[in-house]
Amino acid sequence: MAASRRLMKELEEIRKCGMKNFRNIQVDEANLLTWQGLIVPDNPPYDKGAFRIEINFPAEYPFKPPKITFKTKIYHPNIDEKGQVCLPVISAENWKPATKTDQVIQSLIALVNDPQPEHPLRADLAEEYSKDRKKFCKNAEEFTKKYGEKRPVD
C-alpha cells in the first residue's frame, strides 16, 4: 500500500528531526493510517498545557488529505467542541499530494498559536477574541489549565 510506505518514511523523518511542538508521537506499526501525538504550543494562552491530537490518513493518502481531531478540549475559535479543526492546508480544495505531514502539523501549531477569527468554527469565541482579547486569553488560559495535558519535559 503506497500510503503506508509514504507514511512510514514521513514518520521516520519527523522522529529523526524531532519537532519540539509535536511530541509523544504514537503510531501502531500495524496501522500507519492513525497517528496520535501532543501539540505543545509556544504562545499564551495555550503555553501552559499540551493538546492530544489524532491524525487519520485515508487509504488514498497522499491523494486525499488527512483529518485532524483534537482529543483534548481546547478553547479556540478554529477548533469546535468535537475537536474538529478548520485548517486550510488540509481542506479538499487546497490539498496537494506533495504536502507532507510535518507541514500539516506546522500549520496546525501556527493556527493554535495564532487564532484566525476570520475563519471560525466557533463564532462566539471568534467574536470574544476579536472584541475582548484580554477576556478571551483569561478564559482560554483557565480552560487550558483545567483540560490541557501535562507538557512533556525535554
Swiss-Prot record:
Pathway: Protein modification; protein ubiquitination. PROSITE patterns: UBC_1, UBC_2. GO terms for cellular component: cytoplasm; cytosol; nucleoplasm; nucleus; ubiquitin ligase complex. Ubiquitous, with highest expression in testis. Changing C86S: Loss of catalytic activity. Prevents ubiquitin-dependent proteasomal degradation of UBE2L3. The active site is at C86. InterPro entries: Ub_conjugating_enzyme, UBQ-conjugat_E2_core, UBQ-conjugating_AS, UBQ-conjugating_enzyme/RWD. One of its GO terms (biological process) is cell population proliferation. Residues 2-149 form the UBC core domain. Interacts with PRKN; involved in ubiquitination and degradation of misfolded proteins. Interacts with UBE3A; used by the papilloma virus HPV-16 E6 protein to ubiquitinate p53/TP53. Interacts with CCNB1IP1, CBL, ZAP70, RNF19A, RNF19B and RNF144B. Interacts with ARIH1. Interacts with ARIH2 (via RING-type 1). Interacts with NCOA1; they functionally interact to regulate progesterone receptor transcriptional activity. May interact with NR3C1. Interacts with NDFIP1 (via N-terminus); the interaction mediates recruitment of UBE2L3 to ITCH and causes MAP3K7 ubiquitination. In contrast to other ubiquitin-conjugating enzymes E2, residues essential for lysine reactivity are absent: Pro and a His residues are present instead of an Asp and an Asp residues in positions 88 and 119, respectively. This is Ubiquitin-conjugating enzyme E2 L3. It comes from Homo sapiens (Human). The gene is UBE2L3.
